């Protein structure tokens, strides 16, 4: 029933935008629409949606996996001697305006475009995006559960249950990953551990640096649980922080709170960014805040909507997004504070409740 409803809704969106056919491949539009996760193989898997039908094109060796999924589509299983791109083009038929999945591999897209010369193309995000961006009650429940599981790991970090001093960043990252799985995640998407001067690199890759007394340790981690993602960032300090770090954290907390409170239904996405950025700019940290304030989250860790200057999209009920301002002083230290928020008619609802202090260990 769920996937039949989603296909009906995407057809309505196609009709309203004058799109005659939709083609999605690997990525998350496919499982969102029909519940099937395609393996990222050199063999093409594609879902073709037209006003009349939905057809899933899969390599024959993948067909047994499809049998366990909802039967809301016709199935075409191609043999190794077949041309799956030609089969897909045939299903698109005479459609003139075609939406193509953002994550279709170039090796297939280039060949498909040869078959579809003279057509008009748009991105699938234009027709599937409006469905995915507003989470329903079940999706919000999944985000709550994933956020709570990530919170439990963050609590272990703050309590000192995850040893830090004397271990490498990579060792701590592996420890956090194992704990995410133990708390119910199916997949770990990332576990950033950045200590000392490495914390000034927002997406630092945990490495061989040994964590020591006097370090700030930034931990940004998340995974997928029952199809939906978690994402949280907390920092701890090994020993008492120096005055500039303590002041920066106080300012960062105020900036994050301002961003969360700005994320109300009817406000624009950029207003979240503006609220956090204004606090840090007025506190003298503006030049050290080097990224947007947030990103959407759902089946993907990063998806629409983005909390960034210039995004005038109004926030609507069911929009789920991060609020994660940061301060990064190159060669010295960095910090970030992140929670996931869902916009509701009653105001922003946080998915994360772990304390937001700079915990001293």
Residue ranges and their predicted role:
Residues 1-361:
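Active-site neighborhoods and metal-handling regions in enzymes and metal-associated proteins
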């Amino acid at each position: 029933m769920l996937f039949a409803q989603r296909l009906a809704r995407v057809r309505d969106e196609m009709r309203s935008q004058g799109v005659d056919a939709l083609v999605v491949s690997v990525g998350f539009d496919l499982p969102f629409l029909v519940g099937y996760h395609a393996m990222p193989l050199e063999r093409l898997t594609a879902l073709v949606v037209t006003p009349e039908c939905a057809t899933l094109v899969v390599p024959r060796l993948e067909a047994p996996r499809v049998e366990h999924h909802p039967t809301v589509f016709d199935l075409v299983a191609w043999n190794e001697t077949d041309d799956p791109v030609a089969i897909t083009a045939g299903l698109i038929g005479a459609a003139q305006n075609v939406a193509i999945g953002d994550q279709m591999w170039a090796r297939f897209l280039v060949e498909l475009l040869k078959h579809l010369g003279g057509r008009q193309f748009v991105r699938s995000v234009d027709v599937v995006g409006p469905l995915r961006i507003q989470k329903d009650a079940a999706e919000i429940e999944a985000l709550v559960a994933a956020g709570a599981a990530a919170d439990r790991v963050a609590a272990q970090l703050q309590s000192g249950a995850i040893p830090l001093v004397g271990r490498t960043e990579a060792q701590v990252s592996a420890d956090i990953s194992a704990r995410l799985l133990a708390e119910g995640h199916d997949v770990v998407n990332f576990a950033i551990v950045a200590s000392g001067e490495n914390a000034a690199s927002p997406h630092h890759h945990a490495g061989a640096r040994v964590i020591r007394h006097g370090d700030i340790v930034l931990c940004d981690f998340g995974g997928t649980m029952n199809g939906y993602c978690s994402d949280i960032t907390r920092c701890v300090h090994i020993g008492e922080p120096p005055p500039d770090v303590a002041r920066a954290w106080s300012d960062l907390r105020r900036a994050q709170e301002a961003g969360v409170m700005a994320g109300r239904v009817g406000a624009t996405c950029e207003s979240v960014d503006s609220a956090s950025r204004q606090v840090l700019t007025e506190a003298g940290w503006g030049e050290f805040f080097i990224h947007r304030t947030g990103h959407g989250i759902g089946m993907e860790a990063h998806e629409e909507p983005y909390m960034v200057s210039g995004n005038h999209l109004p926030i609507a009920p069911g929009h789920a997004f991060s609020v994660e301002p940061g301060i990064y002083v190159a060669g010295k230290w960095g910090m970030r504070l992140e929670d996931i928020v869902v916009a509701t008619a009653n105001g922003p609802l946080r998915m994360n409740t772990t304390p937001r202090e700079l915990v001293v260990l």
